[in-house]
Amino acid sequence: MPNFSGHWKMKQSENFEEMLKALGVNLMLRKIAVAAASKPAVEIKQEGETFYIKTSTTVRTTEINFKIGEEFDEQTVDGRPCKSLAKWVSENKMACEQKLLKGDGPKTAWTREMTNDGELILTMTADDVVCTRIYIRD
């Protein structure tokens, strides 16, 4: 099992604004979110299959606690409450499906994967739009 623990800084981001657009975020809020999320600070604490992930930007900070295979509460990237379930899909990769608690919207999910060279790849999806963010240890 890989060790996701550590402080991470973003090295590369693709399609973040496109994903926000797919979620229905208006243009002005998308521009603010893209600017604010250009240098997120991510802290991950892992104890076996239990995770704590804190993501901080200039606009907001989110924190999630979860255990692989157990449903938990979190928010979609645009702030809507959802129930989530993370599972291992390979030795180095977890995938999480999100179900909105209220209303309709695109199907959302995320994955986190450790590469052999120590990078952390976060993918976030909204229907068929995929955002990829690559992090390195800080």
From Swiss-Prot:
Tissue-specificity statement: During early embryogenesis, expression is generally restricted to tissues which are sensitive to retinoic acid (RA). During gastrulation, expressed in an anterior domain in the neuroectoderm in a region that will generate head structures, and in a posterior domain that contributes to tail formation. During neurula stages, expressed in both the presumptive telencephalon and rhombencephalon, and faintly around the developing cement gland. Also expressed in branchial neural crest cells. During tail bud stages, non-uniformly expressed in the telencephalon, mesencephalon and rhombencephalon.
One MF term in the entry's GO annotations: retinoic acid binding
Described function: Cytosolic CRABPs may regulate the access of retinoic acid to the nuclear retinoic acid receptors.
Domain notes: Forms a beta-barrel structure that accommodates hydrophobic ligands in its interior.
Record keyword Cytoplasm present: yes
Name of the protein this chain belongs to: Cellular retinoic acid-binding protein 2
Keywords: Cytoplasm, Retinol-binding, Transport, Vitamin A
Chain span(s) of sequence motif Nuclear localization signal: 21-31
Cellular component terms (Gene Ontology): cytosol; nucleus
